[in-house]
């Protein structure tokens, strides 16, 4: 994930906090590029990246636990501003000679702090509401530091070493519950780190096109095309960079939404004048998935088979060296790092065979979903395509829970088409981040006409979100839900019950598998 040297960068080091991706997002919202990296990154790597500032994230551990995460203390001697958040502040205190101890009880939730007017709190009121989440507490600050905020529960809510530009806060400025959190981060980024905030989709395109051209040269690239937003944006970006050196492979694996295959060929083959090949691999995928019910195994099989299909097509084309994918930053984060447990392996990052014959190109793997949409608009992709519903690489294969069969796929395909049609008719497409139907591996008793039925249950999932990292269930009007339910039960065979998922993320994920 190298950036051009002239690009301003705030480096976020990951200590396992559930909020660490939010830090990255908040910085980017200010027009400054930010990346999340493992805390074990070397000093040489940091120097090579040349960040304007470094943020140490929070984390669930105690700095005194055996094997607790740490950093090379030389980071503090690089002359680069550092901001430690919660665990990051406690670690900074410990490494620089202060004292930290286990608190009698964990402090979690809203708190009031009293802040002094300094660089970090410039222009902000003295009394502020913040969000605390920590089990350790600082009891003595290192030499050269002073207190810049306190609270009823701690004398050290925020500290600074003004000379070395090292800061620490015992709360989470990145979460919405912290009243002036964005302002504090903005002060760090702009006042302390002297960033100008010039990161835009326009200069992202310029940088990526140049990187693609330098890497590819006169060689050829295959793009994994699904018709979804991510792969569409990747295809258009690559086409803009290398033109006819790009061949798009659209694998129709039989796990697509209703009418999706024909739409992809029409929009991209004809509309964008791209070289696109449609491969009918339905039987191939269904044979591989026969008898498989474990979701992780399904994802791996689909990911592997995708690449094998590309291998076959590439051998026909000759001279293809690269495979392009629409991997997002959320895919990379959710697939796990050393500090974070894998939530689920993503098709784009976790299902690739070790004997793959391609070099990977993932030009949007540093972007969140909303940023990809902005990129798509900047590239000239029509809004109705940019705002299409997110669709996972494994397709309906992970929306049929348990073993996949043709009959089950048809239930999901038809019920999903009804859901999307009603949402569109009600004008809710832009209000809801993602919506789809799933088929849980359960049946229930019902009555249709004068007869007892024992048929499938369809689940509706609709969520609101900004970037897909967190979400809440959409508060769809009851009459609209009733309309959707009635149509599904009456128009889709072998369905006698419809349920609505009202779970947020976390604790659940958006997809059911």
Curated annotation (Swiss-Prot):
Q: What class of enzyme is it?
A: ligase
**Molecular-function GO terms, alphabetical:** ATP binding; GMP synthase activity
Q: Which reaction does it catalyse?
A: XMP + L-glutamine + ATP + H2O = GMP + L-glutamate + AMP + diphosphate + 2 H(+)
What InterPro entries does this protein map onto?
Answer: Class_I_gatase-like (IPR029062), GATASE (IPR017926), GMP_synth_C (IPR001674), GMP_synth_GATase (IPR004739), GMP_synthase (IPR022955), GMPS_ATP_PPase_dom (IPR025777), Rossmann-like_a/b/a_fold (IPR014729)
Might you give the EC number(s) for this enzyme? Answer: 6.3.5.2
**Keyword set for this entry?**
ATP-binding, Glutamine amidotransferase, GMP biosynthesis, Ligase, Nucleotide-binding, Purine biosynthesis
Q: List, for all copies, the residue spans of the domain called GMPS ATP-PPase.
A: 199-388
Q: Which residues form a coiled coil?
A: none
Q: What is this protein called?
A: GMP synthase [glutamine-hydrolyzing]
Annotated source species: Staphylococcus aureus (strain NCTC 8325 / PS 47)
